[in-house]
């Protein structure tokens, strides 16, 4: 009886432990990294359009999207540049990684407080392109 009770408790504990472990989300089947190194509205519009097109084209399989902003392109992420703020914020909310190059930030004396809070910083824009 004691052995049976211990076996039942062990099975119950294993079931609870298993139930609390959520399965990991399946990785996206597709991945794309865009680079943005120019400071003009037409290029930013085209980039945001391409992001939307990619998301729609691969929504069934899943797609991981990252944009690396460096050089003059980093101005898209400055809080003072509000023209594309809402669209960039929505992209970030949808899972798009918006990476700001720290090398460019240092060179242009841009601080973390100067860029949108929904962006992330990467050590080097070019290195990030190579890594991903």
Language model features with spans:
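Bacterial N-terminal signal peptides
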Residues: 7-15
């Amino acid at each position: 009886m004691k052995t049976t009770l211990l076996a039942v408790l062990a099975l119950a504990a294993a079931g609870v432990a298993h139930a609390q472990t959520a399965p990991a989300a399946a990785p996206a089947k597709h991945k794309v990294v865009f680079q943005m190194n120019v400071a003009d509205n037409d290029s930013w519009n085209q980039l945001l359009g391409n992001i939307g097109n990619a998301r729609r084209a691969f929504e069934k399989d899943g797609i991981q999207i990252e944009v690396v902003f460096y050089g003059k392109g980093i101005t898209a992420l400055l809080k003072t540049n509000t023209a594309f703020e809402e669209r960039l914020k929505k992209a970030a909310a949808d899972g798009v990684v918006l990476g700001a190059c720290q090398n460019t930030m240092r060179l242009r004396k841009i601080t973390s407080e100067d860029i949108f809070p929904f962006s992330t910083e990467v050590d080097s824009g070019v290195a990030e392109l190579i890594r991903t």
